[in-house]
Amino acid sequence: MGEQPIFTTRAHVFQIDPSTKKNWVPASKQAVTVSYFYDVTRNSYRIISVDGAKVIINSTITPNMTFTKTSQKFGQWADSRANTVFGLGFSSELQLTKFAEKFQEVREAARLARDKSQEKTETSSNHSQESGCETPSSTQASSVNGTDDEKASHASPADTHLKSENDKLKIALTQSAANVKKWEMELQTLRESNARLTTALQESAASVEQWKRQFSICRDENDRLRSKIEELEEQCSEINREKEKNTQLKRRIEELESEVRDKEMELKDLRKQSEIIPQLMSECEYVSEKLEAAERDNQNLEDKVRSLKTDIEESKYRQRHLKGELKSFLEVLDGKIDDLHDFRRGLSKLGTDN
């Protein structure tokens, strides 16, 4: 691979669940670096992501691959060689757009690299065929010239065949030397890449240890802070209880203040009333004197009433006596009147007789 990445971003890496082919399985616990690399030895482009010492993405981009945006911050592509589907979750839509654009560029570059490789293969094949055709022609020309030359006429067909085979072996040897040189270069590149990867792995391991220590420190700090938070929450609970008590006390104080104001108003009214008490007492004494006089008058009146009752009883007795005498008188008078009527009738009868 190339020493420097073509493009680098950060994202959360996912892989499709191989059993269900539907659910996403997180391949990284947090956002990791995802980079495009150009592999010089293989003339190919790759997407590589490493989480600590673990390679979670090593996908070779082919011209028939497609990167699909499934949401504003999530995209995926299928890798048939790895027999899986990779998914990337970005922190913003802009990062997803840049990654998708770079995917299109790299895919087009991979297509061009494949086309060039095919052209070179076809050119090399044609060149080999032309070289193979030229050798029999030269042999045939030598054979023709040999008919004219008496010395050449003595050359056997086996020598001609050996010469042709030697030419072919020279060409193959040249190509083999070139391939060996190319393979040595590729091997050296791979060694350098392995060395860089080993260094990166060692650095990653050291970084992991450092992160572990940092994580342990952070965990201890987190535990301490959690304990502190619990203490503060307990203190807050006590403060809230105290606030509630203070609120109740404030309400009680307000009620007592209201009662005090009412009592002060009552006291003020009583003071006003106490100012008129002497006047009321004098009036009360005056009324008491009048009441005593009225009681004396009432006693006198009662005495008079008793005297009048006695007089009335005597008067009633006299009236009853007079009524009896009057009744006797009226009875006598009625008798006298009856006698007078009889006398008058007698006189009338005497007058009639006369």
Swiss-Prot record:
Residues 1-110 form the WH1 domain. Residues 123-146 have a biased composition (Polar residues). Disruption phenotype: Homozygous knockout mice exhibit early onset progressive hearing loss. One of its GO terms (molecular function) is synaptic receptor adaptor activity. The keyword tRNA processing does not apply. InterPro entries: Homer, Homer_EVH1, PH-like_dom_sf, WH1/EVH1_dom. Residues 160-329 form a coiled coil. Keywords: Cell membrane, Cell projection, Coiled coil, Cytoplasm, Hearing, Membrane, Synapse. It is found in: Cytoplasm; Cell membrane; Postsynaptic density; Synapse. Belongs to the Homer family. PANTHER family: HOMER (PTHR10918). Forms coiled-coil structures coiled-coil structures that mediate homo- and heteromultimerization. Interacts with NFATC2; interaction is reduced by AKT activation. Interacts with NFATC1 and NFATC4. Interacts with DAGLA (via PPXXF motif); this interaction is required for the cell membrane localization of DAGLA. Postsynaptic density scaffolding protein. Binds and cross-links cytoplasmic regions of GRM1, GRM5, ITPR1, DNM3, RYR1, RYR2, SHANK1 and SHANK3. By physically linking GRM1 and GRM5 with ER-associated ITPR1 receptors, it aids the coupling of surface receptors to intracellular calcium release. May also couple GRM1 to PI3 kinase through its interaction with AGAP2. Isoforms can be differently regulated and may play an important role in maintaining the plasticity at glutamatergic synapses Required for normal hearing. Negatively regulates T cell activation by inhibiting the calcineurin-NFAT pathway. This is Homer protein homolog 2. It comes from Mus musculus (Mouse).
